Amino acid sequence: MSSSANSSPATTKFKFTDNLWDGFDLLVKRTDNDLIQSKNILNFFKKKAELEEQHSKKLEKLSLKTMMTIDESTSINAISYNSSWKKIINSSMMESEQHTLLNTSILNKVIQPLQAMIKDMETKRKKILQEGIKLKQDMKEMVDELKKSQFKYDKAGKDLESSRMELREYREQLDHQQQQQPSDSDLNNISKIERRIQRCEQDFSNCDEEYREQIKATNDFQHLYNTEKLPKILNDFEHFVISHSHFSKSYFTNLVSVLIELPSAYQQNYEFVKKSVEMIDITNDVQEFIRKNLMKKQLAQPFQYEPYIEGKLTKKTISLTWNNKILSQFSRSSNNNTATANNTSSGNLNPYLNGGIGGTKKDEPILPTASFKVSLDELMNRQKDNHPTLEVPYVLQVLSTRIAQMKGHVTEGIFRVPGIISTIKETRLRIDKADFNLSNIDDVRTPAALLKQWLRDIPTALIPDSLYQQCIDTPTNAIAIVKTIPIINQRVLCYLINFLQIFTKFEFVAHSKMGTSNLAMVFAPCILRCTSTDANVMLNNVPNERLFVETLIKQIPPPLNTNEFLNLPISMSDAINDSEDIEELNDLDQLSNDDNNNSNTNTSNISIGSGSNSNIVVNYSNNSPNIESSTLPSQSVVTTIETLPPLNDDHNSGSGNESNSSSSNSTTTPTGSPTTASKPRGPRTQTLGWVRIKPAPKPSAEPTITLSSSIAAGTTTTTTTATGITTTTTTTAGPEKTIISPVIIKPAAATPTTTTPTTTPTTTTSPTTATIPAVSTSTIKTSSPDRTTPLTSSPPLASTKSTDELMKKLDQFTQETTPSIRIATTTTPTTITTPTTTATTTTITTDKTTPVTSSPPTASNISSEDLMKKLDQFINF
């Protein structure tokens, strides 16, 4: 009997399902270690086969090369010696063949089967692992649901008990007051409490039913967990371990057979290896593994229904006043925050609820793959394998890249406007689980908020606490302070500042409204952490913290190994939503924007013609006038017309007054007074770093006006229509003239034209083109609902002027660099087209003769030949 008792423990066969019940994690490590060991064995045999092949080739090459040196034809060689030497070389050739055969055998009988086994085992292990993790998760969810239902049940019981206590105490107070008949208010209060008790009883009944159903569902799943699910997974692990050992042993046996098949010279060397392989005992190895990790199989007890027992709540004094009732309700709600373990009679629901499968803790542990609340050194060490060349934490690059992809640099209020809290928490949890795919995020505020959270959650601030006071005392010395912080902190801080410098570009700030100061204010708490808990100190340090970060943004240089956008998906075109609605402003626009404040190009086309073959077009593009010339009929009287830049709605009062006064003065200038020309503004040479969106054009109705009048010479006539068209005309000496009857003004499409500036005078013998002087005395204004475009004409040459004055005037025109236009008065209808800044043109058509000037001047002391030469010179110019 004693012998059998002593032998029984040794003959007991262990099983995973009985002796490793809670060994899921242990088996995961064991199977992973088996696969790693098999991969090491595979690499060893691969290297051995490679060396055998190399040795075979080298030995064969050496033997052939040596054999070629033997010369049998000569008579001076010893025959027996040469014969023996040739046999030695041939034996080396045979040895080379044996190495080749060994290499082939190892490849076919060991390496290839072992490689296939590893691949198959990895697939099986992955499937078992997924099933086990899912089973554990399902069990955890069931226990969590049971925990919630029990909490609701206990809470409903507390509410019911509290209401009953309130009613009982209320009635006791009425009895103490010895009132013969309760008042209406007392009866009303009692009725309210009774109705509340009814609701609480109904809620308690529903929660009780839900609690019982959840207990049944959890017990059913736990039974399935204990009898089928978990035993199957443990059996799969056991089969995996045994199969792995069995296959490995068979491949070792194949190797031994290959070695034994070698010639007898090698056989003795591998006899010991053969014996050691034969001694492998898989069953004993498995039993020894279980014996070393014995676990007691202890199944969890079924969940029991635990009824709520009254008497947990302490007696409270309830006053008849409503204020005390409200305070008592707050007191009761605060008492509801007690531990869940006290909600049941036993005080303990299940081992799972206290750190078991479904256990939850107040302070969640940091995941092994977490990126938040982890030191910079640990993050850098963790990413050495996957991102060896990255000098900053990978999470920082992922968040900044996603912000750039979602155009955060042109998003208004970026980093300042908060995101959706639930989305931020969900995304943060995904990142902590090493899921850095943020492509499904549709709100740029989410990665922006996570970037700030990541900076705030670093255990040690980017600027160490020991340097905080120095940063507050000397915020302008930020660069020198940054040089003293750790290297990894410097890299992260420089990357962050270079990233923020992108947002400070004028083009992006125009959209985001987040300049250097705003960004510094937002990121100061992320970079600096106040060491004091005094609210006054923290508040007083805010300006210096902001100044410190602002100094960093302004003084830290851009990186050398990347572009200005850190190789992020950012370009300057992101600031332009529509090329037609965006303009650049240059420094000249800042100095003199009275004439053009909302457009980068001002295009005005003026067509004044006599019939279909006489036309002059002036195109203003980029404030540089380009003139297209056409034919004017001969014997035309010449006058001048200048197109003034359109008035803008957003002018200040000063500029508007200046423009109005100039127009008013031009209409009252005497006919004989000389005119002076001002140079147009030159081409833009430098653009500012920001843009402005032009206002959308407003639709304008087609205005129609008919004017018919006779005016005397030397008078000024101003006519304004209901549609906002103002016509001002100054007449010269001469008979009365009938003007503009009828006049039709209609919008026309504007076609910008670019031509070469030319200036040509008008003669009486050939068609010419003329120029536009800079000053005029007669103005025609066309007003649309949103723009006013003045059209100004200068006075004609007076008949009283001498030829000398005319020659001086031509010399002056020759020296001027400003192109101008002279328009001949004809007896055919005249068309004037002036596009406004709203991309429409206004056409004025006159059907009657519109004389503008008096008779041509007469020569006084110069011949016609000299005059023609001067005109030719002017034409050539």
Curated annotation (Swiss-Prot):
The record marks R416 as: Arginine finger. SUPFAM superfamilies: BAR/IMD domain-like, GTPase activation domain, GAP. One of its GO terms (biological process) is signal transduction. Disulfide bonds: none annotated. Residues 589-612, 644-704, 749-800 are annotated as: Disordered. The lineage of its organism: Eukaryota, Amoebozoa, Evosea, Eumycetozoa, Dictyostelia. This is GTPase activating protein homolog 2. Residues 14-285 form the F-BAR domain.
